Every structure is written in C-alpha cells, then in structure tokens.
Amino acid sequence: MARGNDIERVVADNRKARHDYFIEETYEAGIALTGSEIKSIRAGQVNLRGGYVRIVDGEAWLYDVHIAPYEQSGAYFNHEPTRPRKLLLHRREISRIAGQVERQGYTLVPLRLYLRGRRAKVEIGLARGKKLYDKRDDIARREARRDIERALKERTRR
C-alpha cells in the first residue's frame, strides 16, 4: 500500500517548453510558498507558460509563474500571482546548474509542477532553444510516425 508521501499528482505541465527547447537535464526542486499559494496549487490554479528560473546570489528563483489568488480567502491574506518564488535545491546542485547556465544559449525552464504527498515540487529543465527549422523537423518526424502507424493499422484490419 502506498504511503501518503509517495503519491504524486501533476498539477501543471509546461508543454510549450518542450516544444520551444531541447531539454538536456532535469532537476527536482521544492518551492517556498505561502499558505494561499499552496491552496491554489492544490486547486490546480497554476500556469507555468512563460516561466523561467534564474540563479541570483547563489539562490535559485522562479519567475513569471502564475499562481491564481485563492478564491476562499480575503484580499488581505492573498498573494501576488506572479511574484518570484525561491526554489529549494542543494548548494552543490545550484552551483552545478549555475556553471551550466553560464554556457552560451542555455536557460532553466519549469517543466511541470506536482504535489508529492503534502509538498509542492517543480521539475526544472536545463534547456537550449530550438530554431525554427528544428521545430519543423520535429513536426515532420511526428507526421511521418503517424502516417506509418496509420498504414500499419489499415494493413492489420485486412
């Protein structure tokens, strides 16, 4: 039987990041949140599109991720929807990531946000931007794969 902290539920997925970037490596990080933010996350009110991660003074910060204000709380107790949020990583992970981001053309993007037990986690990816022709190649490969699967499906029907 699975314990409560083993259950993982994906709250938000950043499919646009996988379309716009080549993901080289992924890391799991915790997030420092307020009470109304975690309640909104549990309600699924999160948008990762356009978000990015920066390393500032040896700390990882998540920017431009929209967590909607919690509906049941008053205006006084609510949070700012797109405020920077501190990511919780080990010091050696941060220094390793910072060294990799220093290289030309690499960035850190949030890939998905999920709940593991009672804790919110974000999967961040070390990414390199795709050019337009890379995106077209991906689309052509996907369409070719669909055509092959369609042909095989028709062949097995006979």
Swiss-Prot record:
Gene Ontology MF annotations: RNA binding
PROSITE patterns of this UniProt entry?
A: SSRP
Which Pfam families does this chain map to? SmpB (PF01668)
* Gene3D superfamilies assigned to the protein according to its UniProt record, in alphabetical order: 2.40.280.10
List the GO biological process terms.
trans-translation
Q: Which UniProt keywords apply?
A: Cytoplasm, RNA-binding
- Gene Ontology cellular component list: cytosol
From which domain of life does this come? Bacteria
Subcellular location(s): the record lists: Cytoplasm
Q: What does this protein do, in the record's words?
A: Required for rescue of stalled ribosomes mediated by trans-translation. Binds to transfer-messenger RNA (tmRNA), required for stable association of tmRNA with ribosomes. tmRNA and SmpB together mimic tRNA shape, replacing the anticodon stem-loop with SmpB. tmRNA is encoded by the ssrA gene; the 2 termini fold to resemble tRNA(Ala) and it encodes a 'tag peptide', a short internal open reading frame. During trans-translation Ala-aminoacylated tmRNA acts like a tRNA, entering the A-site of stalled ribosomes, displacing the stalled mRNA.
What is the similarity comment for this entry? Answer: Belongs to the SmpB family.
Its recorded name reads: SsrA-binding protein
Which gene is transcribed and translated to give this protein?
A: smpB
